[in-house]
UniProtKB/Swiss-Prot annotation:
Heterodimer with IL12A; disulfide-linked. The heterodimer is known as interleukin IL-12. Heterodimer with IL23A; disulfide-linked. The heterodimer is known as interleukin IL-23. Also secreted as a monomer. Interacts with NBR1; this interaction promotes IL-12 secretion. GO terms for molecular function: cytokine activity; cytokine receptor activity; growth factor activity; identical protein binding; interleukin-12 alpha subunit binding; interleukin-23 receptor binding; protein heterodimerization activity. Keywords: Cytokine, Disulfide bond, Glycoprotein, Immunoglobulin domain, Secreted, Signal. It is found in: Secreted. The gene is IL12B. Disulfide bonds join 50-90. Residues 23-106 form the Ig-like C2-type domain. It holds the Pfam family IL12p40_C. This is Interleukin-12 subunit beta. Belongs to the IL-12B family. Residues 1-22 form the signal peptide. It comes from Cavia porcellus (Guinea pig). Coiled coil: none annotated. Glycans are attached at residue 218.
Length: 332
């Protein structure tokens, strides 16, 4: 959040903390209290102010405690552990006047907690967020893993460079798979003014705000689109007999999602045949080509696979597109 936004948030009031830097507004009426997490830490003093013009007859309650916590327009609490987090409500009579939610972001030995997301193996070591782009259109997908199946929420924001909090629009995070041990979430993002042919001077930054019950954490990934490119597999993979009856011609097309024109955004391809020959010995053959066809040997019990990557920049390879050699009739 930029300096101007912080000033605006605090002037809008409802909640004040001491010191100010120990707490900030995540969204309307939801606040994050940052805590040093060790035995002797004093915690943070938080002053809640009821958002009302009323002055008298106001009482305070908490979602997590049955007793009335105090009376008056303000309530001072000491936030030290998760029992102090949750919802705080001010009332007058039977009417709810305002409500605020406190989340805790804990720091141990100067390191912020990373308990909600699971580490994944990335290209440059371990990471919590993985992102891929299928082209240079500015559209990309990020995903992450968590062990929590319930009481978890995510929100995602993106930017082109940390100084500009806009420029990238991200959708709602969605669960795409899961079992009793691991759940995968993903989000689609789009750079608002993407120019596929322009040189990238600033990286894209993606921040995931993660909430599990009353715990808050955030995770950041910074990258250039060119570094997360992974094309879709080649499409329309076909085999036909060649003049040499012991070989076949395999042909394919660029994936529909790849950037155009293809003369500028060119792909290179890896063609691979593997299987067992008549003597049941494993055979594997690889061919690199910039064309969209190749001639290969293709035994009936083998298959042909083709994958693609950016011709001029060392992107990730696409997944394989494959076709069985049994689909073409050639004499052996």
């Amino acid at each position: 959040m930029c300096h101007r936004q912080l000033i605006s948030s605090w002037l809008s009031l409802v909640l004040l903390a001491s010191p100010l830097l120990a707490m900030w507004e995540l969204k309307k009426d939801v606040y994050v209290v940052e805590l040093d997490w060790h035995t002797d830490a004093p915690g943070e003093t938080v002053v809640l102010t009821c958002n009302t013009a009323e002055e008298d007859g106001i009482t305070w309650t908490s979602d997590r405690k049955s007793d009335i916590l105090g009376s008056g327009k303000t309530l001072t609490i000491q936030v030290k552990e998760f029992e102090d987090a949750g919802g705080y409500t001010c009332h007058k009579g039977g009417e709810v006047l305002s409500r605020s939610q406190l989340l805790l972001h804990k720091k141990e030995d100067e390191i912020w907690s990373t308990d909600i997301l699971k580490e994944q193996k990335g290209s440059n070591g371990k990471t919590f967020l993985k992102c891929e782009a299928r082209s240079y259109s500015g559209r990309f997908t990020c995903w992450w893993l968590t062990a929590f199946g319930t009481d978890v929420k995510f929100s995602v924001k993106g930017s082109r460079g940390s100084s500009d909090p806009s420029g990238v629009t991200c959708g709602e995070a969605e669960r795409v798979s899961g079992d009793n041990q691991e759940y995968k979430y993903s989000v689609e993002c789009q750079e608002d003014s993407a120019c596929p042919t322009a040189e990238e001077s600033l990286p894209i930054e993606v921040v995931v705000d993660a909430i599990h019950k009353f715990k808050y954490e955030n995770y950041t990934s910074s990258f250039y689109i060119r570094d997360i490119i992974k094309p879709d597999p080649p499409k329309n993979l076909q085999l036909k007999p060649s003049v040499n009856s012991q070989q076949v011609e395999v042909s394919w097309e660029y994936p529909d999602t790849w950037s155009t024109p293809h003369s500028y955004f060119s792909l290179t391809f890896l063609v691979q045949t593997h299987g067992k020959n008549k003597n049941r010995r494993e055979k594997k053959y690889e061919l690199f080509t910039d064309k969209t066809s190749a001639t290969v040997s293709c035994h009936k019990i083998s298959k042909v696979e083709v994958r693609a990557r950016d011709r001029y920049y060392s992107s990730s390879w696409s997944e394989w597109a494959s076709v069985s050699c049994s689909e073409v009739s050639v004499s052996r």
